[in-house]
């Protein structure tokens, strides 16, 4: 069997693609990847040899575009979907699995036009525009936040490095795969207070702020573990006892898999405020704290860090997500729906 995996744009979407690829390989399913020249798709998968083939199309997002530009983008997407139909024929694609994001649009529409099964995984608590549009036409729609809960695909390595946290010795700041300027500034402002408490700093700052953050820590004579981006984030997480993080869904569930307690600062401009609702999923179970970016008081925030019951939260996070989530999705999509697959 050969399937197409499509979608991306951000690290969160692409992490799911990688999990699905690894699961498909275990089941002897070949995968073709269809993404975009824009976003992070090429950086993640251009050199990924496990795909049968990879295509990076000229697809673009439509968020914040004018009405004319949106119409133009839609017409361009329909043109690209024709190219995808040719890809499907050439590689004998039997099903399409979308993880969302604008780069999923051409292949997803092509699946419908080609009468191929379309399986969609929505990573966030609030569905993106493309997934909302396609949901009624999908063969199966998966979400960890829906009433019919589906497992969230998280790489095994995050589970393998899990441990129960009991004492705050190391704190990790996570701004997402591209970094976050606000969280970087927060980390730098908290650094002297953390040093006074002998709390070590691990800091993912993104490429744009790397030199600035590095120099600031040096000026404070603080030996922080600072990095722009890491494909082995689980190695950084396992050394941490608390995370200060944005609330992208992949990051949130990776933290849960690692049983790493977190304070979330949702990105305030995320579509439909989905990062807030992602974090609220845990807050409603008393498994995290949420601070809104525009109302953070540094002293109050620091007090909250010190008050957290790390052991209680870390222990209960073990029940939030489960290992082999991607395996379960592949099973539910492809093997439980064989009547739809030619």
Curated annotation (Swiss-Prot):
> EC?
2.4.1.227
Keyword Oxidoreductase appears in the UniProt entry? no
Q: Which residues bind UDP-N-acetyl-alpha-D-glucosamine?
A: 10-12, 124, 177, 275
Top-rank lineage group of the source organism: Bacteria
Provide a GO biological process annotation: regulation of cell shape
Molecular function GO terms recorded: UDP-N-acetyl-D-glucosamine:N-acetylmuramoyl-L-alanyl-D-glutamyl-meso-2,6-diaminopimelyl-D-alanyl-D-alanine-diphosphoundecaprenol 4-beta-N-acetylglucosaminlytransferase activity; undecaprenyldiphospho-muramoylpentapeptide beta-N-acetylglucosaminyltransferase activity
| Location in the cell | Cell inner membrane
Q: Does the keyword Acetylation apply?
A: no
Q: Which topology term describes how it sits in the membrane?
A: Peripheral membrane protein
Which reaction is recorded as catalysed by this protein? di-trans,octa-cis-undecaprenyl diphospho-N-acetyl-alpha-D-muramoyl-L-alanyl-D-glutamyl-meso-2,6-diaminopimeloyl-D-alanyl-D-alanine + UDP-N-acetyl-alpha-D-glucosamine = di-trans,octa-cis-undecaprenyl diphospho-[N-acetyl-alpha-D-glucosaminyl-(1->4)]-N-acetyl-alpha-D-muramoyl-L-alanyl-D-glutamyl-meso-2,6-diaminopimeloyl-D-alanyl-D-alanine + UDP + H(+)
Keywords of the record, alphabetical order, are:
Cell cycle, Cell division, Cell inner membrane, Cell membrane, Cell shape, Cell wall biogenesis/degradation, Glycosyltransferase, Membrane, Peptidoglycan synthesis, Transferase
Metabolic or biological pathway, per its Swiss-Prot or TrEMBL entry: Cell wall biogenesis; peptidoglycan biosynthesis
Annotated S-S bridges: none
Per the record, its GO cellular-component terms are: plasma membrane
Cross-referenced NCBIfam families = murG
HAMAP family linked: MurG
Query: Which function does this protein serve?
Result: Cell wall formation. Catalyzes the transfer of a GlcNAc subunit on undecaprenyl-pyrophosphoryl-MurNAc-pentapeptide (lipid intermediate I) to form undecaprenyl-pyrophosphoryl-MurNAc-(pentapeptide)GlcNAc (lipid intermediate II).
Matching PANTHER family: GLYCOSYLTRANSFERASE (PTHR21015:SF22), UDP-N-ACETYLGLUCOSAMINE--N-ACETYLMURAMYL-(PENTAPEPTIDE) PYROPHOSPHORYL-UNDECAPRENOL N-ACETYLGLUCOSAMINE TRANSFERASE 1 (PTHR21015)
Report the family membership.
Belongs to the glycosyltransferase 28 family. MurG subfamily.
Q: What name goes with this protein?
A: UDP-N-acetylglucosamine--N-acetylmuramyl-(pentapeptide) pyrophosphoryl-undecaprenol N-acetylglucosamine transferase
Q: Which organism is it from?
A: Campylobacter jejuni (strain RM1221)
Gene symbol of the encoding locus? murG
